[in-house]
Structures are given as C-alpha cells and as structure tokens.
Amino acid sequence: MASNEGVENRPFPYLTVDADLLSNLRQSAAEGLFHSFDLLVGKDAREAGIKFEVLLGVYTNAIQYVRFLETALAVSCVNTEFKDLSRMTDGKIQFRISVPTIAHGDGRRPSKQRTFIVVKNCHKHHISTEMELSMLDLEILHSIPETPVEYAEYVGAVKTVASALQFGVDALERGLINTVLSVKLRHAPPMFILQTLADPTFTERGFSKTVKSDLIAMFKRHLLEHSFFLDRAENMGSGFSQYVRSRLSEMVAAVSGESVLKGVSTYTTAKGGEPVGGVFIVTDNVLRQLLTFLGEEADNQIMGPSSYASFVVRGENLVTAVSYGRVMRTFEHFMARIVDSPEKAGSTKSDLPAVAAGVEDQPRVPISAAVIKLGNHAVAVESLQKMYNDTQSPYPLNRRMQYSYYFPVGLFMPNPKYTTSAAIKMLDNPTQQLPVEAWIVNKNNLLLAFNLQNALKVLCHPRLHTPAHTLNSLNAAPAPRDRRETYSLQHRRPNHMNVLVIVDEFYDNKYAAPVTDIALKCGLPTEDFLHPSNYDLLRLELHPLYDIYIGRDAGERARHRAVHRLMVGNLPTPLAPAAFQEARGQQFETATSLAHVVDQAVIETVQDTAYDTAYPAFFYVVEAMIHGFEEKFVMNVPLVSLCINTYWERSGRLAFVNSFSMIKFICRHLGNNAISKEAYSMYRKIYGELIALEQALMRLAGSDVVGDESVGQYVCALLDPNLLPPVAYTDIFTHLLTVSDRAPQIIIGNEVYADTLAAPQFIERVGNMDEMAAQFVALYGYRVNGDHDHDFRLHLGPYVDEGHADVLEKIFYYVFLPTCTNAHMCGLGVDFQHVAQTLAYNGPAFSHHFTRDEDILDNLENGTLRDLLEISDLRPTVGMIRDLSASFMTCPTFTRAVRVSVDNDVTQQLAPNPADKRTEQTVLVNGLVAFAFSERTRAVTQCLFHAIPFHMFYGDPRVAATMHQDVATFVMRNPQQRAVEAFNRPEQLFAEYREWHRSPMGKYAAECLPSLVSISGMTAMHIKMSPMAYIAQAKLKIHPGVAMTVVRTDEILSENILFSSRASTSMFIGTPNVSRREARVDAVTFEVHHEMASIDTGLSYSSTMTPARVAAITTDMGIHTQDFFSVFPAEAFGNQQVNDYIKAKVGAQRNGTLLRDPRTYLAGMTNVNGAPGLCHGQQATCEIIVTPVTADVAYFQKSNSPRGRAACVVSCENYNQEVAEGLIYDHSRPDAAYEYRSTVNPWASQLGSLGDIMYNSSYRQTAVPGLYSPCRAFFNKEELLRNNRGLYNMVNEYSQRLGGHPATSNTEVQFVVIAGTDVFLEQPCSFLQEAFPALSASSRALIDEFMSVKQTHAPIHYGHYIIEEVAPVRRILKFGNKVVF
C-alpha cells in the first residue's frame, strides 16, 4: 500500500477510508470467501461463473439472521437452528396433554385421568432472493493489481460484489421477518370473534343453535363497540388511558397463554428480568398513539438471545410431551420426570434443553423495544412498517375494509302527536308533516340532502315498472296458493242492455260473498298485514306498482298475472294509510299553492245533504228529466229554483249537489237572485273549488309536451282524457275515440264500439227540442214498441267542448263528491217511461182547465206524483210540472251501462299479458248518482228508479240496500259486505282488478273525515305511479307514495394491531442453498433459497388482530346514485319520445349523437365518463330499495338487513340449503330478528319481489347493476347463501377449536384462521347480512339540534325523525365550531 501522501495526490478519494477493507470483509462475510477467490484461475468467464457458486454457498452458510432476533416480533417465537430441515418431508410433533379434574365430596364417582395427544403440524416456508454479479468484476477480482489504477479497480470490484451479496442477505433477513409475520397472521383470528368464542360464559353451554345465535349477537356487539378503539379514545376526554388499557388487556386475555413450551422465556425486560409476555405488532401511527396514551416504561429495552439454539433430532421417534406444565423430550424423559421423580419441579433451565440443545448457553444482548405494562404483564410494542415502506411493499397490518350503510327516505310515522325537542320550531301545523328527504353528512362534514331527485335514475327506469321477472319467479314456484280468486278478475259482457235485470239476477238468491285480495288487504292494520299468519296475502304483495292475482291461461293452468295500480291511491291501505294520504294532500296544497275555495261549512253542508234520509226524491225526477241538457235546465229554471229554495229554507241543505251538470248550470243561470244568496254562494264555492283543484293539478304537471300529448295525462289520472266521468249525458265516447291513441273500446252489451266510422250504429244523437220536434212521434213509437234490451244504441246529446270542463267533472265525481259524502252514494238507474207517466198522466199536467200558476197539489189526485211531492215537501205550480213533462220529449227510455276499456299509458304498459295492459271503467249513460232512500221514498219510487252499484265510489252497499230489496237481503245475509271495499258488485258492471279506482280509494273515501285536507288527499291519490309523475313530484317536493331505503358501501383504510403471546410459535431455520439461475457473457445470476419451518406451539389461539384506527375513508360517503339507464341500457318503454323525455329529465347518461356500442346491450354497462375531478374522494354508489312508508323507523336505528328481513341463518342446527332458503325467503315463518312479523318490506325481502329482481343477478337478462352494486351482497341468492354457509362453517370450526373439545391424533385440529375470516373482517356486512345505520335526519333542523351543545338531541319531532350512526367507524362530525363524536 502506498503512503498517505501518495494517496492524497491520487484521483480516487474513496481509497483513503478503505485501507483495511479486506480484513473488514473477512470478518463480516466469511474467511472462506477470499480464500476461495484464490482458487479461481483461468480466463473463461463461464467457467469462473460456475466455480463461483461454491464461493456463494460458503458465504451464505454464514448468514445468521441476526436482525430478526433483534426485533420484538421474535418475542413470540422460539427460534431454533435446524440444519436437517431439508430432510423433513412431513413434519408433525405430538404433545401429550392431561386434562385436570376436580375431586368432589358429594359421593360422585371420581373422574378418571384423561390424556390426549395433540398433534402439531410443521409448515415449511421457502424464501429466496436473487443476486447478479458482473463478469467484469469477477475477472478483476482474479487479477493481481499492480498499478494504482488497477488497485482502484480491484477495490471497486470487491465493493460491488460485497454490495450484491449484502443486498441478498438483507432480502433474506426481511424475508424471514415477513414470513414470521405472515405465520402470525395465519394464526390470528379477529378480536371480535376470538373474544366471544373464548368466553367460557358462552362456550360452557355447548354450541346449540341458541348459543350460536348469542355468539352472532356478541360478534356484532364487539365489532361495533371495540373496533377502531384508538379513534374512540381520542375524543373520550378523561379516562381514555384506562379505556385503551382495557382494550389492550382484553386482547392479551383473549389469546391463550398456554403453550407446549410452558416455562420458556427467551426474552425478558432489561431491568428486573421480568418475562415479556408477548408483543403487539402495530403501525407507525398506532405506535405513536399508544405511547402517547399509555406512556413508555422506563425499561425500554429487552434482553434477547444473540444466536439460535440448535435443534437436533435423536432417536427414531421424537415425542415432546407436556404434562402438568412440564416439558419432556422423550418417553424415557417422561418416565424419569413423572414416574421416578414426580415431586421434582421443573424449571426453565431444566425444561428448555428438552426442546433446543444449547439454549442455556446462548449469549444475550439488549434489544431496543418499547415496553408497556398491562396489569402484571410486560408487553413489547413494535412497528415493522418501515421495513415494508423501504421495500415499497404493502404492510400486512394495513387493510381495506368495506362497511355497508343504509338510511330511509320518506318514512311516515303514524299519529305523530309528540316531540322530544323543545328547541325546534317548524311550521304552524307540524303534525301533518311528511318527510321527503334525508339529510346526511359526508366524510368531509358536508351536509347533503338525499331526496326524490337523487333517486329518479332508478325510479324512472323501466326495470322498476315491469312485473315480468316477478311473474316468472312466481310461475316457476312449485305450486300456487290454495285460495284462488274467481270474483272481480274480469269484466263479463252481458248479452242485453237491461241493467235492472243484471242487478236483479246478480243479487237474487246470492249466498256466496267472495272478497278480493285487494279488499282483504284494506281491512288489515300494518302489523297484522306483515304478520306470518297473513302469509297468504303477503306472498303476492311483491311489487308496489302492481296488483298480482292468479288467473288461468288458455290451457286452464293457474298462472300469476299482474295489473298496474295506476295511482298512488290504489296502494294497499296497510302500506299507505289514510293519514299518509292526507299528509301527501297537504304537501300537494303547499307545493301547488292551492288555495281552497270551499270552507268547512260547505263541506259539512254537502255531508249533511248526503246523509239526509229525507232528501226529496222528486229532485231525482227533476235531474232525470234534465239529464245534463242545458236547454232543459233553462226550461225548468223556476222549478229548479223552487226546489233549491224550499230545501235550503227547510233544512239548510243543498239540492242537486250530487250532479256536476246541475251545479254547473245553477252557477251559470241562477245568479240573478233566483235562489237564496247563501245557497248560491255555496254552489259557486263548490264550482270554484273544482277550478282551483284543476289549476293546482296543471301546475303540478307543468306545460311540457311529450310527442303531441300533454305530459299531464302521464302525471295524474284526473288529467288523463282516457278516464271518463262516471255518468254521461253527451257523446263523450266518440270524442274519446277521436282524441285517444290508446285503443279505446266502448263495450255496449256484447258489442264493441271502437271506430268513429261506426258512430251511427252505436250513437243516437239527441239535439235540442227545436231540432228534435220532427222526430217526437218516432221517438214515442220507439219508446213504446222498441226492443230496448237488445238495442245497443246510446241516446246522447252532442259533445260540447268547454275547455277543461271534463277535468272539472272528473274532479267533482272522483274527488269532491266521494270525499264530502264519504262515498255514501250509489248509482241510480232511471225508467224514463215510468217517470214520464208519473209526471204527465194526471189532470193538471195536460188539462187546459188549470192555469200555469195554480198549485198542483191543490188539484192533484192521489197517485205517485202526489206522493212524491208530499214526501219531498214541495209545492210546484202546474206550469212547472208541464215544463218538466215537456222535457221528456227527447229523453231516453232507460239508463244504460257502458264499459270503457283503454290501454294504459306507455309507462304503465309493461305487464306481459295483453289483457293486463288495459284498464276499464263503467259509465252510466243517462243515469244518476244518488243518496240513500228512506223507506217511504223507496215505496214511492221503486217503479221509477233502481240501484246500480257500478263504481267503488258509487256502490255503497248501505245505500244500495235502501234502493233494492235483493241487495238489502244479500247484505243482511253477509254482514261483511257492508264494507264499501268488500261489497260484491255485478261483474257486468265492475271488475276490481280492471278498475281505475280500487278498494283502497273506496275505503279512504268511506272513512275519511270530510275536510279540506281530505279533498287535497284524494286529489293527490289520483297522481299516477309513473316516471313522469315521479319527475313532477320531485320538482315540487311531493312524496311519491313510497319510501326508499338507500344502501351505500364505503371503503375504510384501517390500521390493525396484532398481538401474539410469547413462545407461541417455534421457528426452525434451515440451511441455505445456492443455485445458478442464468449465466450470460456479461453477468451471472444466482438464486439463494432458504428453507424455514414453523410450528404453532399454543394450546389454543395465541394471536389475535383488531382494527385500531381509521387511516382514511376512501369513499365520499355521499349521495351519488346508481344510474340504471347506464346499467340496463337495453330496457326501455314502448315509445321513443317518452324514453327521450324521461332521460332528459332525470339527467341519465347520454352518448350524444353517437350510436350505442352494440356490445353494451350484452354487457349491460356503457362507457360512462366519470366526473372530471373529485373533491371528496371516490364516489360511493347509493342504490335504492323501494320501501313501504309504514316501515318501522326503529328498524333503521340499528344494524339490519336492507332487504327488510334477517338473512343470517348461522343459528341453524345443521346447515342445509333448503332450511337456509326457508329462513331467508319463507315468509310463513316469522323474521328471525323480529318474530312478530315476517318482514318490514315485502317489496324487497320475498323471492321475486321488486328489490329481488332489481339486485339479484338470477333475474338478469343483460347484466347486474354496474361495476359495483352495494345491494348485490344482500340480494344475490347464490352469494347470500354462500356467505351464510361460510359464516356457519366458520363459527363451527372456531367453536370446535375453542369449545373445550381437545384435539386427538385423529382430528389433528390446528389453531389457524379459518377460511373466510379475512373476508369476514374486511366485509362483515356481507357475512352478517346487515348494514349499519348512517347518520340521517328527515329534517335539517334535527341535524342542527344534534350538532348543538346539548348532551341530548331529538330523535323524534312529530313526523320527523333522526337516525344516529351505529357503525364500527365513529366519525367526528364538525360544523363550524360544533363537534359531535
């Protein structure tokens, strides 16, 4: 070596510090390395590469893995060098365990000693690393440096080779640490499982299904209360240190302290020599928090071995037995220790050589490690995260977890007559408030409102509006239910036009009184409807938009069919009660700025009139003679005025209030003081109310046009021209055929009028008196001699288009009148011939001896007319009766009943059966709707009028019974028929499953309190259940009639804690093996393989893991909703203009002018361009489950299944797929979680229900929802059953290991993590089939109060509610300076 001066003058400054490089390398690597360098001779690089393998083998044999021994992770291991490890093929070690017994003094027979053989499997692990050495460096090493430059190159080559070797050694060191950590994780079940199963309070009872149910409950409790405990401690205030200590102590206590190496303690504290009881492996952040919370012990060092003990196999069989805590090496050792010297106590010094030779001579060195004191245990704490960070590898203790959250939108709380808040002040009348939105808080504490607008991309999609999948599911069932409906499924066409005969034949000697399912549902409260005993009705309540029934196909096979419910009012009463409908009505008032014209006095007057048993029957005669003709009304103004004034003065009630045309004509012609001002004011208010309601409906619908049609007909049935008034005097039928494009059919008897060209065949136009004067004789002859039963012509006046008069008439008959009268009315047929004879065939009417001004009663003989006038308390003049008689000249002969059938609108036409796509109604032609008759009235009028119960609003059995004796007999024979919804009506006139108005609306009308709210409620009940209606209601914040359960899955980045007890794993370190992988001209690549083995030495689970803190929430916890138009692009409504309108309104993804990729119709997912940027993280997708508004709000205040019925069946006695399916889907059994009901949401929990077909991939025709569906795990049948089976097996496997069943040589049970545990830890909601409640409130005021400084808040405020977040992740909510944890 040259002098220092020479070195300084050379351009190789690094040589100044490497003067003793060779000696250092000899000491640090191996003496044989450089000795072997001298053996390499020759210039062939390949030959040199081959020979260098020998060198490398010598070098790697010197690897000591000292770094692992210097980690706290080694505390939990007994580390032994086992040079013969490569010869081991099937490693098993047996341990003998004697079970202690208790000696009893009560005479019981002593227990025999029981000894079991525990078999521990040895698992091999292979780690390897790669080293690449340059041929140029090797050649330089073989040369002899002579010049300073050569010497510098020589030193550089040595450095390069040594660096490559050191790189490989470091990789192997890290590989050993990673292997040990992986082994620990393989034996570390989650804390919430281990803590429950290790509790003898549960396990000593065995593992029956009752105990398993308790175990699952404890799983959930520990998961909720103890996950992420460091986050909870941060905001706990005082006592946080004790809380953290208790959680860590529970981890220490949960694992088994028993080990087959009992007494072995290779690591102790530096001061005091106290054994280290185990180690917590944590992340850097958790380590800092723990030391901050608990403080570090003064003794922050532990003493550990600096080398490995040697494991030597001696004898043919190596048997290590543990008996009474003593370690034996062989059976001879067993005999010497237990038999020969039973009193001699074992010690660590004497026991340890039984396992590892030379352990007592191991040198010990201090190791820097954090130590915390938990009770009487000293426990080391270490983070290995830096090693993984340096190598850019994921740290095993950092995990991604997915938690599902759910919250309700639009629940209705019946009778909300109280509040738990004294701070909130809302509207003047808060008792009728109806929630339409849910306020939630995203992860960045931004307050967001989830309302109907957010859900339109789901609610307006065709998949929600089709029953096809539901029907396929039902028809695929083994057999339909026993009870099949036969009544009111289809309209039956009569072969004649005599309505009186139809009614007589139907009720004459009728004994059977079937009740439809729709009517049966109306009579049940929500609790009874959802009860398991009501399964027969509940099983067909699968879809909120359809009534499902059992019909027959052409082959007389029973098939399920579905008809659209059309309107919100047709929802079953248990799922949409009357109070809810009235609350919707109030929302409708507010949203449309409806100012009622009528007041309560008018409503009460109308109601008094309807229930007036002395209502003058003569008024019906007057109304029949006028029958909607304005000309005839003008002719009879004096008589009409007399009727109104007399009735008003006598009783304070309104005449003719049952007829829209009469009210319209009264308002138009009697405003000149012809009648009482008070009475006229009431008529005007009634008519004004109709106009106000019509204008409110127009504001609701808006002015949009879809194609050539107003959007109003898609929004509200009252605005749909295809719905006709219940009575007709003018030719509204031909007008319907002209304006409707929905294939209307006018069924007249057994004839069908469907083309305006056939109008002369079916319509007999009746003009005014002057026009018809020449036909009076012909009309008379027809009335006397015509075959009226088989004459299918309708005598109607010409249709007069008066703007929105048709809508006003429908509002009157379908809203105002049934609401104010409680539907206490019935259709009334008129025998015009007999009425004419009663009026005209008397002396004063046609004799010239009487003047017009004479009182007719003074000159009238006894007869029907006199009786009518007397019971009506009316004294008309002779002229009035003559004018009324003259009105008969153009009257028809009888009242006719016509059936009108039309297609549903295109959004409600998705039923598979063509007949189910149509809706029907009966219209009385030249008929009336009347109030109840008194006994005296019926005796007088029985030959003039007859009852026609033809409509849900105009078929009250109590009223019909007063008009028709057969009806009265039928009702008396069947008392249940007194209910409006249950009353049987002739099938030629009524078929409930085909009607616009069905039992729920009839029940509401019959039972509502006549009021302004009821009028608004009935109006809102006519809003359709269609996409356009949902769009309109979303715009005005009106409740759509159904609630929603919103499900969202959020992803959490968690930092976990692993605890492992001391000596719980025995690690065997073998010898390395070097092989050449690749030899090139420029370099040689070597692989170093190292074998290791591990044995779990614990007598139970000796390690556990639990989430300690939330590192980050990766999703935004927001309100982004699944776009079904992108998920299911192939499904559409039958009209392209309608599709385009809906997509434009809901903001569905569109591809511009580009044609859709045909592959998307198969794959089901279009290329949706995401947002250009994100502010709150990855958008969490929300999905909608349609839910009844009567769902129990308490259900959403704890973790439950979003389906509405528990789906975790782990408590089965023996897992069987058929049993599991029964517990999940069989609603004849009670819900396992709520035994008093089958479900909280029949529209989602049953097979084939709407929720099931939306999110169960069994029904997919194109694809399942999106790239990710948070609902799929709760609905997909295969996945649901797989998770159930996995959880069942997991609980059984853990129970077998922890339930006191010792292992034997036959079972060889190992204490490892059961398959599926990681999924359970990371996705617990999928296994438990429950979602966690998210913080939400139906009003922002409740959120504000929740964030106030008060300790308590208001969970209920009249109709509003707040749901607290109950989830493993406890979020810190901060608005301004207000913080809530």
Swiss-Prot record:
Keywords annotated in UniProt: Capsid protein, Host nucleus, T=16 icosahedral capsid protein, Virion
UniProt subcellular location: Virion; Host nucleus
Top-level taxon in the UniProt lineage: Viruses
InterPro entries: Herpes_MCP, Herpes_MCP_upper_sf
SUPFAM superfamilies linked: Major capsid protein VP5
GO molecular function, one term: structural molecule activity
GO CC terms of this entry: host cell nucleus; T=16 icosahedral viral capsid
Pfam families given in the database record: Herpes_MCP
Homology family: Belongs to the herpesviridae major capsid protein family.
Function, as annotated: Self-assembles to form an icosahedral capsid with a T=16 symmetry, about 200 nm in diameter, and consisting of 150 hexons and 12 pentons (total of 162 capsomers). Hexons form the edges and faces of the capsid and are each composed of six MCP molecules. In contrast, one penton is found at each of the 12 vertices. Eleven of the pentons are MCP pentamers, while the last vertex is occupied by the portal complex.
Assembly, per entry: Homomultimer. Makes the hexons and eleven out of twelve pentons. Interacts with triplex proteins 1/TRX1 and 2/TRX2; adjacent capsomers are linked together in groups of three by triplexes, heterotrimeric complexes composed of one molecule of TRX1 and two molecules of TRX2. Interacts with scaffold protein; this interaction allows efficient MCP transport to the host nucleus. Interacts with capsid vertex component 2/CVC2. Interacts with the small capsomere-interacting protein/SCP.
Name under which the protein is recorded: Major capsid protein
